A protein has these predicted regions:
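A short, well-structured edge-of-sheet supersecondary motif
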Residues: 82-120, 295-296
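Bacterial N-terminal signal peptides
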Residues: 49-57
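Structured C-terminal helix/loop/strand segments within mature extracytoplasmic catalytic/sensor domains
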Residues: 65-87, 223, 233-339
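Mid-domain, small-residue-enriched loop/turn segments at the edges of structured enzyme/sensor domains
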Residues: 173-243
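Active-site SXXK
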Residues: 124-148, 161, 304
């Protein structure tokens, strides 16, 4: 970790990766998830299919299709410099210096080669309703295990929890999932969405009500917390089909679409790109403002996460998303910019 004018900046290191299998997620899953027809896959048989398998074997584990093992290993110097310049232009340097603002921006147009920039990515902050995405993950894990049913009523309740940020819906789903189950899931080796070695992450330690906390996060005593990095990891795993399964990742993403609350990222982005697709969850409580999204338009896809502690935080995020969107397009590698 280095520091630029007092705020934490993730070092830009050489990207490393993992090979064709990620936990329960395999290369074939990735190909199907990203649009390859199953019928087409079946047609790849005989010598062609054998050649494909032999190619993977001969290439060895170091050369098979990769996704990064950790987003912190994908820092892009051009994107990083652009983000820092944008913060200066928006007069937000002081906020980052005092750790009142944390940001992660990841270009995932090519999911096998993400480009990340960040400021204070591991700063744990109160995130209000944003951690409802963790409840969504817990529900789909239960569904995958046959312990919950994805019936129309459950789907409607989860959609209301995410798009309208309904506290009542969140509490209903949280109690069906189980508080202890969710806490264990977030800390599991499979997801590490709450990681003590990275200063925490996504945490849901109480219902969204006046009731007391069930279990505050171990490091910072927060009831509903997040770091920008772990939220970005959630969205990256979602987009690459690694939350629960490729099919259930798609269903979770569809629930995150069409946000009903039009502030922060949505307000800023729709003012300049009204046709953009936003898969999003935000949070607001007093001076705490957070937003997170996968954003798609004009051939590019990226993850944006920002957490702020300021009465002006909502305005910060509306302005920031416009600058980050512009940066994604201006900093795109030449080969991708043509797509």
């Amino acid at each position: 970790m280095n520091y630029l004018r007092g705020h934490a900046v993730m070092p830009c290191r050489m990207q490393r990766g993992i090979t064709a299998t990620w936990g329960n997620f395999h290369l074939l899953d990735f190909m199907i998830y990203n649009g390859y027809s199953f019928k087409l896959m079946k047609r790849i048989n005989g010598i062609i299919w054998l050649s494909f398998i032999l190619t993977l074997i001969i290439a060895g584990p170091g050369n098979a299709y990769r996704l990064p093992a950790d987003l912190t290993e994908t820092c892009d110097p051009v994107l990083q410099k652009g983000l820092e310049k944008s913060l200066t232009s928006l007069n937000l340097e002081k906020a980052t210096h005092h750790k009142s603002l944390s940001i992660v921006l990841v270009d995932i147009t090519d999911p096998s080669s993400p480009r990340m920039a960040s400021v204070n990515p591991n700063e744990m902050m109160y995130a209000a309703s944003l951690p409802k995405i963790a409840i969504l993950l817990g529900a789909f894990e239960r569904i995958s295990n046959g312990e919950m049913t994805l019936d129309p009523q459950t789907l409607e309740t989860m959609t209301h929890m995410i798009r309208n940020s309904s506290n009542q819906a969140a509490n209903e789903i949280l109690n069906r999932v189980g508080k202890a189950y969710l806490a264990d899931l977030l800390q599991s080796s499979r997801y590490r969405l709450y990681d003590p070695e990275k200063n925490g992450g996504l945490w849901v330690g109480k219902e969204y009500s006046k009731a007391g906390a069930w279990k505050r996060d171990p490091l910072h005593n927060l009831s509903h917390g997040a770091t920008a990095l772990q939220v970005a990891r959630f969205y990256y795993m979602l987009q690459t089909g690694r939350l629960v399964s490729p099919e259930l990742s798609r269903q979770m993403k569809s629930i995150l679409a069409d946000p009903a609350i039009k502030h922060k990222f949505v307000k800023g982005l729709k003012s300049v790109h009204p046709d953009s697709r936003i898969y999003r969850k935000s949070g607001t409580w007093k001076q705490y403002h957070s937003d997170s999204a996968i954003i798609e338009h004009d051939g590019r896809r990226y993850i944006a996460v920002a957490l702020a502690k300021s009465s002006r935080g909502g305005k910060w995020l509306s302005d920031l998303i416009v600058a980050m969107d512009d940066l994604i397009f201006k900093s795109a590698p030449a080969d991708l910019a043509k797509n």
